A protein has these predicted regions:
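Active-site glycine-rich loops that stabilize anionic/oxyanionic intermediates
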Residues: 32-35, 39-43, 118, 252-253
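Catalytic active-site module of serine/aspartate enzymes centered on a nucleophile-bearing elbow/loop
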Residues: 271-273, 277-312
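N-terminal cap/lid segment of alpha/beta-hydrolase-fold proteins
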Residues: 1-27
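Alpha/beta-hydrolase fold nucleophile elbow
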Residues: 106-118
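Alpha/beta-hydrolase-fold enzymes
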Residues: 124-211
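Short beta-strand/loop motif that positions the catalytic acidic residue
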Residues: 248-250
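Alpha/beta-hydrolase active-site loop
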Residues: 84-104
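Conserved alpha/beta-hydrolase
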Residues: 47-78
Length: 312
């Protein structure tokens, strides 16, 4: 039986106690590796509980934390979906490393792996650049590639609202600019989050979850655009450890990945940067949250496990 521990550790911002989960396989199962998960925007780490329990049955320890401004890391009276006034992206990436240090100390002899979903995939990409060689394999799920003109334009808009209303503010204009197009691909829409999943029950659970779905702040948009720009620069891409295998895995109908095109572009960029072992897996008919598509869940879980098993 899986044993899940909950604990807190200090964020690199020097003030926030981050909530973390550690799911440990039954002691009768041989431990093979540790997988650290970085979750997406406007959600929380406990949404990955079912996936963690599956991997526990395969002997893989699973851990993750709620990012700054998310889930149970949000302090009372704090601003949801907000990394902070300054250096937010840096803090979020450094927090991933903070948990990595805890895990690598506790499980010294086990391979350390990482998986990032959506915003977590972009944080993971920054992590692979800033902390090369710390992880023995990486999975980038629900990721994409943004054209330079979109990053430049989006950054100008975000900065305008940031200086006008502050980083903790929200903007309907920016939210529509960032996410509105995602849902239009699936019109007529049943909800504002149809783009997440073809599984209506999953979408409804997301909407009903009080720790999901809050509008991202202007500050987080600014931070994320800056992080994506950092990730896509060739001068940074070549800083990654070329020997760290990477799996790009997404739904073919995921608008975050431009219906597969942005995922392929990211995959090509990693190969061009010298990463030796890059795998691409796209699922026809699946949207953004491929772990939560019940019709294909067993297949997706199994494919991820099979890929990890090449290295652990």
């Amino acid at each position: 039986m899986t044993n899940c521990e909950h604990f807190r550790f200090l964020s690199s911002d020097g003030k926030t106690q981050l909530h973390a989960c550690l799911c440990i396989p039954d002691e009768k199962i041989k431990f093979r590796a540790v997988l650290q998960i970085a979750h997406g925007v406007a959600e929380h780490i406990e949404r990955y509980d079912d996936f963690a329990r599956y991997l526990n049955e395969q002997g893989i320890v699973v851990a993750g934390h709620d990012h700054l401004g998310h889930g149970q890391s949000l302090p009372e009276g704090g601003t949801p979906v907000y990394f902070g006034e300054k250096d937010g992206w840096k803090h979020a990436v450094d927090d991933i490393h903070g948990l990595h240090l805890i895990l690598s100390k506790r499980y010294k002899r086990l391979p350390q792996l990482i998986m990032g979903h959506s915003m977590g995939s972009f944080l993971t990409r920054s992590y692979l650049i800033r902390y090369p060689g710390e992880k023995q394999a990486a999975i980038l799920m629900g990721t994409g590639w943004q054209p330079g003109y979109m990053l430049t334009g989006g950054n100008l808009v975000a900065k305008r609202f940031f200086y006008k209303n502050g980083g903790a503010s929200t903007s309907n204009f920016i939210t529509e600019l960032a996410f509105g197009g995602y849902n239009r691909a699936f019109a007529p829409n049943r909800t504002g989050f149809d783009w997440l999943s073809a599984d209506t029950e999953n979408v409804d659970r997301y909407i009903a979850d009080p720790m999901c779905g809050a509008d991202a702040t202007v500050g987080l948009f600014r931070d994320m655009l800056g992080g994506i720009r950092f990730n896509q620069k060739n001068v940074n891409l070549v800083k990654m450890d070329p020997n760290t295998p990477v799996l790009f895995i997404s739904g073919q109908d995921d608008p975050v990945g431009a219906m597969g095109k942005g995922v392929q572009r990211s995959c090509d960029a990693f190969r061009s940067a010298g990463v030796k072992d890059v795998t691409l897996k796209l699922y026809p008919g699946l949207r953004h949250e491929i772990l939560n598509e019940k019709a294909m869940q067993n297949t997706v879980y199994g494919d991820i496990h099979d890929w990890l098993s090449r290295y652990v």
